[in-house]
């Protein structure tokens, strides 16, 4: 008998999935942040990503079974969003996981039970796939579940074999598909036919380890990793034609349609695509900002900026000309908040980020679209790479936006030319990025397979005995190291704090019989503490018993700075905005740094209030209380957790009663009075929506004030002024400098005009127009523009092109065309000078009658001017 699937809401599907596996001894875990711990990916792209260290054997599982609803973002198919029934950037992956517990038979049985008994999908509408060599899975589906063999499709490794990389854990997978058109029969089951089938449940059986030679050996502990797309199951159960029309997304689409004055049901396909893009992208944007991501031009910040810009762009295509994103986001927040309360908590931050990005991009669109329209006029089939780069460099137009707009007009973009023009900036950008040496990390991963995690004693002990478990030189395991060598040492236990949570690692010494190792840093990875240092005396080898002693003075400074950082976050929330959240931190021996999400700078008055409040808390001598408790209890108490951090079932809570309550694994003072004094030294913006406060505490405050006093004294001596007179004296000098610069600019312009007056006799007459092309030497760009305008006015109906080299290697170009010339000859100064500038390796543009451009190759200037003259003679003759 055929069953009819119930019509379930998205939240009901999510909860029924989690309840099903909770009833089968799975621990329900909250979704991890979209900012992953895994440094190899920008964003959380799969439900299994938070468990990857467990699957790779780098970390032990706290539970044998788990189930989650994981928020994910993927942008690799962004161009398909809205154009297909089920491509998204944001989606939720429902998953059940086994870490060395149940395996293939049980996973398949539960997947089938959930699909047919809970969600009541008719068995005759389900088709499954297995890896072509996985006879075991095929037999389970056929013999234990009872699926006819012809409805079990064997597929190749590309579709049905999961790998974590070239080597490591891997295994076959099996997928369940829903058949929208069973009336077509079973004769030809093509699972790649998206109009008929939708894959909604993927079961990965991690049962092998692949070595360097490609050989597969069975794993001792086999794992299960599954994923069910929430949006896909909602499409099936809600009986709608695509994921976008489910209750998970359609309310957002409807909000956008209402703003645009559009009836979705009557809209054409192009309009629906734009509405779907907005519906999808706004979900991504809301969750990304809520998880602490701010728009920028790098990494995940750029992904966010690109998504926001696509929302704005598609809004424009719908005829929405004003700001609208916050209204659409409000609907997304309401849909998300029952499951993701942090979204509602950060709604004001989300709105501020969207308002700022939308306003900035609308200006970019207005400027860039005008130039782009000119570039696409007159039957152009391709936009030159240099022009695309000008749009990017001058107007902030991303290449993909130029491509998107051009594609709508059937025009291509010279991407190779764009990349060539971009090369220098790319090289500068690469040079600015820190090179990460993974050698030691790779060694640690190897060590983690046969060395127990290091026991940390440093919360209570500043000195302890320990046994050397591993010695590394240059990141390679060695048997021993001798005096003079730089080493990395792993101990069975240690009082040294390993760098984490923003706090720097301890310094100190390892002592033994005729052995002394100076430790300069300690890092913690894969549960192992690695001590970086230099052997000063003797020989160290595996099994050596040593005494580990930390530098107490450095520890005291670090813990004072760390507690001060907690006080700083609390003060920021009280003085500036309760919605402020941490975006990063650094706790050093001599200073501290705190990064936080804020759409605006902190004012001088607010900074003073924050500083005063922290010093008040220090003077009040609050005791610091440390407790370890279940994470649920900590959150119930209101403890602040940092987004992006992954916490275990038990967490360490640092409580300064009535002042601050945070989850933290760092070291802290026992009483705030130990901090001594606190001083803010800087507040800056480090990215869009991210601010940074730098400060000093304790003895470092005195060091800071001594340096400031010396600077003030030197300034007073140089300015011949008392300290209190320095501001007035500096203001006086600034005014004098400003007046001098004004006089200098006037002289430069006068000189340029005098030079230009001498050129009038060089003008060449062509028909009813005059042409003047000349090089004015080293005149600056502004003076060049003034001269070109003046000459054109004096010559009457004319075309004037002037050039100069204001500084070494840099070319300035200006074109001034009379109105009649523009009208009758259809010549536009912007297009003309842009083409000439390309000869000098540059670009530019402007109005039809007046435009400026620049170039990077001054040696090509004579050729550029000759081309300009020849072109004008040909066009006007």
Swiss-Prot record:
Catalytic activity reported: tRNA(Ala) + L-alanine + ATP = L-alanyl-tRNA(Ala) + AMP + diphosphate
A GO molecular-function descriptor: tRNA binding
Presence of the UniProt keyword Cell membrane in the record: no
Recorded superkingdom: Bacteria
Pfam families for this protein: DHHA1, tRNA-synt_2c, tRNA_SAD
EC number: 6.1.1.7
GO BP field: alanyl-tRNA aminoacylation
UniProt keyword terms in alphabetical order: Aminoacyl-tRNA synthetase, ATP-binding, Cytoplasm, Ligase, Metal-binding, Nucleotide-binding, Protein biosynthesis, RNA-binding, tRNA-binding, Zinc
Subcellular location: Cytoplasm
Top enzyme class: ligase
Positions with a binding annotation for Zn(2+): 562, 566, 664, 668
PROSITE patterns noted in UniProt: AA_TRNA_LIGASE_II_ALA
Listed cofactors: Zn(2+)
HAMAP family: Ala_tRNA_synth_B
Family per record: Belongs to the class-II aminoacyl-tRNA synthetase family.
Function in brief: Catalyzes the attachment of alanine to tRNA(Ala) in a two-step reaction: alanine is first activated by ATP to form Ala-AMP and then transferred to the acceptor end of tRNA(Ala). Also edits incorrectly charged Ser-tRNA(Ala) and Gly-tRNA(Ala) via its editing domain.
Record comment regarding domains: Consists of three domains; the N-terminal catalytic domain, the editing domain and the C-terminal C-Ala domain. The editing domain removes incorrectly charged amino acids, while the C-Ala domain, along with tRNA(Ala), serves as a bridge to cooperatively bring together the editing and aminoacylation centers thus stimulating deacylation of misacylated tRNAs.
Protein name: Alanine--tRNA ligase
